C-alpha cells in the first residue's frame, strides 16, 4: 500500500514521579538504550519525515542525551493532558501528511505493528491501536456501534456498563495532519481530570462520519507503558526473552536464555556457543564456531571464526582474527587487535595494542600503545610503560621475540626481530635483532646470613 508522508509526535513531558529518580522517566534504559531512544529509532525506521518530541520536565537532560537525533523540540510547559501535548505540536503539522502519535515510555512498540497501523488508516479517518484485557481497570474503553468504533471513554468518566468493555485504548493513533489540527482545536477539558484528552478526537471524527479502524499489536508487551522501576524491569525481561528466542531459532546455542542479555545488535555465524551471564553490548559480530564462556562482556567488537573467550573476560572495541584464545579474566580495551591464533591469558590487559599471529601473552601483563609481531612470547608480569605523566608513547616488538617475565619496556622503544629479553629487565633503549638484553644487578650471596629476630 502506498502511504502518505508521515511525521511522528512522541510525548515525553512526564516527570515520572513513581520512578523516584532525578532523571526524566523516558531516559531510563531498557537493554542499554533509553526508552525514548527505542521509540525514536522505531519512528526513523518507519521513515518519518519529522520527529516532534514534546518535553516538559528535565528538558536539558533530554536534549543532552538526544543531541545526536534530528528532533523538533516542542515544549509543554504545563502538563494538561495528552490532547494539550498534541496541541503544542500541532503548528508543525503539514496538512497533507499523516501524524503518528507515540509515547516515550512505551519502548517496545514494534515497527511491524506501526506499519500495519499505518497501512490500515482509512482515507480521511483514524487508525487506532487497541488491545483486549481481562482486567481493563484504569484504561480508556473503546465504544462501538454495530462493530464500528465510535469513541473512547476514560475509566474515570465511564459508566458501569462501559467499564465492562474489555477493549481498551493504547494511546497510539494515526490521522491526517489537517484533520488532526481541526479536531485538536475542538478539544475541551470538561471531564473528571480537567484535562484535554487526545482520545476525544475519536468521537469528533465519528460525528463527522469518518471511519475509525482498530488494529491490534502482535504482542501485549508492545503497548505496555512504564511508570515505575518494577514495570521497567519486567519489560526488560520480556525484551531479553524475545531476543534470546530469536537467537536460539537462528542457531546460536545459549546455555541458559534467562541469563543472557543483548543490549545492542549481534551478528553471528554458525555453531556459536554462549554460556550463562554473558552481556552483549553495542554492535558485536561473532564468526563461525565462536565460544564465549560464562560472565563475559563483549561490546562493539568483532570476533573471528573459531575464537574462544574464557569466563569473565571483558572485550570492548576490539578486533580478533580467527582462532584466538582469550582469558579467563582478561581485558581487551578499545583499540586492542589480535591477529590469527594469538593468545591472551588471565589477568592480561591490552589497549591500543596489536598482538601478531601466534603470539602469546599468557598472564599478568599490560600491553598499551604497542605493536607486537608474530610468534612473540610475552612473559608474566611484562609491562609496556607507555605514559610519562603527560604523553603516551609506543612500544614496537618485532617477530620471534622472547620477552622474559617481569620485564618493563619504557616507551618509546623498539625491540628487533628475534631478540631475547632476560627476566627482570628494564628496557630503556632500542634492542637490535637477535640480541640478548639484560639489565639485572649482579646477584650477591652472603653465606651464613641470619634473619633478624623480632624483639619481645
UniProtKB/Swiss-Prot annotation:
Q: Where is this region: Pyrophosphorylase?
A: 1-229
Name the pathway it acts in. Answer: Nucleotide-sugar biosynthesis; UDP-N-acetyl-alpha-D-glucosamine biosynthesis; N-acetyl-alpha-D-glucosamine 1-phosphate from alpha-D-glucosamine 6-phosphate (route II): step 2/2; Nucleotide-sugar biosynthesis; UDP-N-acetyl-alpha-D-glucosamine biosynthesis; UDP-N-acetyl-alpha-D-glucosamine from N-acetyl-alpha-D-glucosamine 1-phosphate: step 1/1; Bacterial outer membrane biogenesis; LPS lipid A biosynthesis
Q: Where does the chain bind UDP-N-acetyl-alpha-D-glucosamine?
A: 11-14, 25, 76, 81-82, 103-105, 140, 154, 169, 227, 333, 351, 366, 377
The record describes how the cofactor is bound as:
Binds 1 Mg(2+) ion per subunit.
Keyword annotations from UniProtKB, A to Z: Acyltransferase, Cell shape, Cell wall biogenesis/degradation, Cytoplasm, Magnesium, Metal-binding, Multifunctional enzyme, Nucleotidyltransferase, Peptidoglycan synthesis, Repeat, Transferase
GO MF terms here are: glucosamine-1-phosphate N-acetyltransferase activity; magnesium ion binding; UDP-N-acetylglucosamine diphosphorylase activity
| Database matches in InterPro entries | Bifunctional_GlmU (IPR005882), GlmU-like (IPR050065), GlmU_C_LbH (IPR038009), Hexapep (IPR001451), Hexapep_transf_CS (IPR018357), MobA-like_NTP_Trfase (IPR025877), Nucleotide-diphossugar_trans (IPR029044), Trimer_LpxA-like_sf (IPR011004)
Q: Quote the catalytic activity from the record.
A: alpha-D-glucosamine 1-phosphate + acetyl-CoA = N-acetyl-alpha-D-glucosamine 1-phosphate + CoA + H(+); N-acetyl-alpha-D-glucosamine 1-phosphate + UTP + H(+) = UDP-N-acetyl-alpha-D-glucosamine + diphosphate
Q: What class of enzyme is it?
A: transferase
Instruction: Provide the active-site residues from the annotation.
Output: 363
Q: Give the Enzyme Commission number.
A: 2.7.7.23, 2.3.1.157
Which residues are recorded as binding acetyl-CoA? 380, 386-387, 405, 423, 440
What is its biological role?
Catalyzes the last two sequential reactions in the de novo biosynthetic pathway for UDP-N-acetylglucosamine (UDP-GlcNAc). The C-terminal domain catalyzes the transfer of acetyl group from acetyl coenzyme A to glucosamine-1-phosphate (GlcN-1-P) to produce N-acetylglucosamine-1-phosphate (GlcNAc-1-P), which is converted into UDP-GlcNAc by the transfer of uridine 5-monophosphate (from uridine 5-triphosphate), a reaction catalyzed by the N-terminal domain.
HAMAP family given in the database record: GlmU
Concerning its family, UniProt says:
In the N-terminal section; belongs to the N-acetylglucosamine-1-phosphate uridyltransferase family.
Give the quaternary structure: Homotrimer.
What is the protein name given in its UniProt record?
A: Bifunctional protein GlmU
User: What is the scientific name of the source organism?
Assistant: Escherichia coli O127:H6 (strain E2348/69 / EPEC)
Amino acid at each position: 500500500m502506498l502511504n502518505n508522508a508521515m511525521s511522528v509526535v512522541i510525548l515525553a513531558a512526564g516527570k515520572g514521579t513513581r520512578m523516584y529518580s532525578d532523571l526524566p522517566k523516558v531516559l531510563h534504559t531498557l537493554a542499554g538504550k533509553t526508552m525514548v531512544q527505542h521509540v525514536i529509532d522505531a519512528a526513523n525506521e518507519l521513515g518519518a519525515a519529522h520527529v516532534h518530541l514534546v518535553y516538559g520536565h528535565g528538558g536539558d537532560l533530554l536534549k543532552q542525551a538526544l543531541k545526536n537525533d534530528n528532533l523538533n523540540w516542542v515544549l509543554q510547559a504545563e502538563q494538561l493532558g495528552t490532547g494539550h501535548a498534541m496541541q503544542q505540536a500541532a503548528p508543525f503539522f503539514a496538512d497533507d501528511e499523516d501524524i503518528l502519535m507515540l509515547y516515550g515510555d512505551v519502548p517496545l512498540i514494534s515497527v511491524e505493528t506501526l506499519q500495519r497501523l499505518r497501512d490500515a488508516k482509512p482515507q480521511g479517518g483514524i487508525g487506532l491501536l487497541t488491545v483486549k484485557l481481562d482486567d481493563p481497570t484504569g484504561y480508556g474503553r473503546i465504544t462501538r456501534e454495530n462493530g464500528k468504533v465510535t469513541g473512547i471513554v476514560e475509566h474515570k468518566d465511564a459508566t458501569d456498563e462501559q467499564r465492562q468493555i474489555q477493549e481498551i485504548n493504547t494511546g497510539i493513533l494515526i490521522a491526517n495532519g489537517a484533520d488532526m489540527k481541526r479536531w485538536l482545536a475542538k478539544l475541551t477539558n470538561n471531564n473528571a481530570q480537567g484535562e484535554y484528552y487526545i482520545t476525544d478526537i475519536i468521537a469528533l471524527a465519528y460525528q463527522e462520519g469518518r471511519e475509525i479502524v482498530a488494529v491490534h499489536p502482535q504482542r501485549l508487551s508492545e503497548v505496555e507503558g512504564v511508570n515505575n522501576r518494577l514495570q521497567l524491569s519486567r519489560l526488560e525481561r520480556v525484551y531479553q526473552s524475545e531476543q534470546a528466542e530469536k537467537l536460539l531459532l537462528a542457531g546460536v546455542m545459549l546455555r541458559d536464555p534467562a541469563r543472557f542479555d543483548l543490549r545492542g545488535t549481534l551478528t553471528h555465524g554458525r555453531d556459536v556457543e554462549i554460556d550463562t551471564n554473558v552481556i552483549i553490548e553495542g554492535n558485536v559480530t561473532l564468526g563461525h564456531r565462536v565460544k564465549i564462556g560464562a560472565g563475559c562482556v563483549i561490546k562493539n567488537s568483532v570476533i573471528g571464526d573459531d575464537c574462544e573467550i574464557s569466563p569473565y573476560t571483558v572485550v570492548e572495541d576490539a578486533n580478533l582474527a580467527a582462532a584466538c584464545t582469550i582469558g579467563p579474566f582478561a581485558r581487551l580495551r578499545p583499540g586492542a587487535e589480535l591477529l590469527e591464533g594469538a593468545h591472551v591469558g588471565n589477568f592480561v590487559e591490552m589497549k591500543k595494542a596489536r598482538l601478531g599471529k601466534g603470539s602469546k601473552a599468557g598472564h599478568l601483563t599490560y600491553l598499551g600503545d604497542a605493536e607486537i609481531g608474530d610468534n612473540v612470547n610475552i612473559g608474566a608480569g611484562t609491562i609496556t610503560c607507555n605514559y610519562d605523566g603527560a604523553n603516551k608513547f609506543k612500544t614496537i616488538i618485532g617477530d620471534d621475540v622472547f620477552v622474559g617475565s617481569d620485564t618493563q619496556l619504557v616507551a618509546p622503544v623498539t625491540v628487533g626481530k628475534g631478540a631475547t629479553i632476560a627476566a627482570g629487565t628494564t628496557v630503556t633503549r632500542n634492542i637490535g635483532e637477535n640480541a640478548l638484553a639484560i639489565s639485572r644487578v649482579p646477584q650477591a650471596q652472603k653465606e651464613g646470613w641470619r634473619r633478624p629476630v623480632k624483639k619481645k
